[in-house]
Structures are given as C-alpha cells and as structure tokens.
Regions:
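Conserved class I S-adenosyl-L-methionine
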Residues: 1-52, 156-182
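A conserved beta-strand element that flanks and buttresses the S-adenosyl-L-methionine
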Residues: 126
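Class I SAM-dependent methyltransferase SAM/SAH-binding core
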Residues: 59, 65-114
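Core SAM-dependent methyltransferase catalytic element
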Residues: 215-240
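Short alpha-helix
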Residues: 196-214
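A short, conserved alpha-helix within the catalytic core of class I
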Residues: 133-144
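Short glycine-dipeptide loop
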Residues: 149-155
Length: 240
C-alpha cells in the first residue's frame, strides 16, 4: 500500500532510513538479540499480548525492521506500518524470523501521523522506540489510536523519558523542569512542552495527562535500554 499524505515526521523518516541505513539497522538487530534491554522489551510485549483475548488483531506503529514481530503471541493478523520502504523490505526477514507466530502480516508503507485505518480495526496497537522519540506523542495521535481500537483494546508504547542520560541536561532544561510545577496553568503548559521537546519526550505525568479521558492506564513502568531511559505504558480504551 502506498504512503499517503506524509507529514514532516514521515518525510524525515523516509529520507533518513534509506536502503543503506536500513541494512545497517537490520544488522544491528542481530547484535541486540540476548541483551538485557532487548529481552526486556520482548518480555513486556509478550506480557501485553497475554492480556489480550486470542486470537486478536494488532497494529505495529513504526515497525522498522520488524524487530519485535517475534514477541507477538496470539495475534491473528498483524498490520505493520512504516514511512520507510527500505525498512519495510528488511521487515520481511525480521530478527528471529523462525519464532514469528503471526500467520498474516500486512506491510503498509505510510505515515503513522496521517495514514488512516478503519475505526475499531484492532485489539492491540503497539509501538516501541518511535513515539515520544522520533514522532511526537500528542493528543491528536492518541485520538487516532483510540479511534482504531475496539472497545477495551490496548495501546502499548514506549517513550523516551526526559530524565534519560541521552538527553543533555542543560542548565535551561534543569531550570525549566524545576520551576514548571509552580507556574500558572498556561505558562506551566508552555514550559512543560518546551522541556518535553514538543512531545519528543514523555514522562509519567505527561502520559497520565494524555490518557486521562477515555482510557484506563493498566501499567506504567520504566526500562533502561542501551540508548535511553524509557517509559513503558499500556493504556486500555474504555469499553463504554
């Protein structure tokens, strides 16, 4: 399926992850296998799958090379979207391909910020290493995912925490983080948005804000990878 209405985020990803980069990225997958961080993400996604009534339908937002396809359990049909055709080509031969149990995988070349799926199409939408990292996690995207989920469906995703060692803790950032809670509403929100880089980082408080209405947060934990400190969230769409 062709990409539709690319945003600047999708265009940037498609440009960055060209054929050469995608091949190197896929080679990096092989080196990640067995590391504590990778195993932590796999165990988390498997646990999320265990909460869903099998068989169920899933969407991978920003699937990349299909690094986590092997973690899925009980999935009847998987849709995997990415803005890079080169990454999708690599995802056809993902890490631990012999462990992938999903019978039907549909690859979609598209921008997750603008591509549309049917309302109520999925029981699980998941995204690892994309949201609040390469793509801003903001209310419009949360609303899109909510629309795509069936009642009671789950949205499982990682973010980069603003306290991650990978983020330079400049004096301005430290000052902004310390004074933001004491400022009046509009100014506090503006400064918080600056600290969170317009949605490219998200801490527990920001996740709770985004999922305060129409969702129930089932779990919200931290995980340290080789690159970042992450939040791992599972939010469930309201049944009624």
């Amino acid at each position: 399926m062709p990409a539709t209405h690319p945003t600047r985020w999708g265009t940037k990803a498609a440009s960055l992850y060209d054929k050469g980069y995608a091949a190197r990225y896929r080679s990096h997958d092989d080196g990640l296998a067995g590391t504590a961080a990778y195993d932590g993400f796999v165990a988390w996604l498997q646990e999320v799958c265990g909460r869903c009534a099998a068989p169920f339908d899933a969407l991978d937002l920003g699937c990349g090379t299909g690094r986590y396809f092997c973690a899925l359990r009980g999935v009847r049909a998987l849709v995997a979207i990415d803005a890079s055709e080169a990454m999708l080509a690599q995802a056809r031969h993902p890490l631990h391909q012999d462990q992938v149990t999903v019978a039907a995988v549909t690859m979609v070349h598209g921008d997750l910020m603008s591509h549309e799926f049917a309302a109520g199409q999925f029981d699980l939408v998941y995204s690892i290493g994309v949201l609040a990292e390469h793509v801003p996690l903001q209310p419009p995207l949360v609303a899109r995912v909510q629309r795509w989920l069936r009642p009671g469906g789950r949205f499982a995703f990682s973010t980069v925490h603003p306290d991650s060692r990978s983020i330079p803790q400049t004096p301005a950032r430290r000052l902004g983080s310390s004074i933001a809670p004491w400022l009046p509403g509009p100014l506090r929100r503006h400064l918080r948005d600056r600290v969170l880089a317009g949605g490219l980082y998200a801490d527990e408080d920001r996740v709770r804000e985004l999922f305060a209405s129409g969702w129930a947060i089932e779990s919200l934990v931290r995980l340290e990878s080789e690159a970042h400190l992450h939040c791992l969230c599972v939010a469930r769409k309201a049944i009624v």
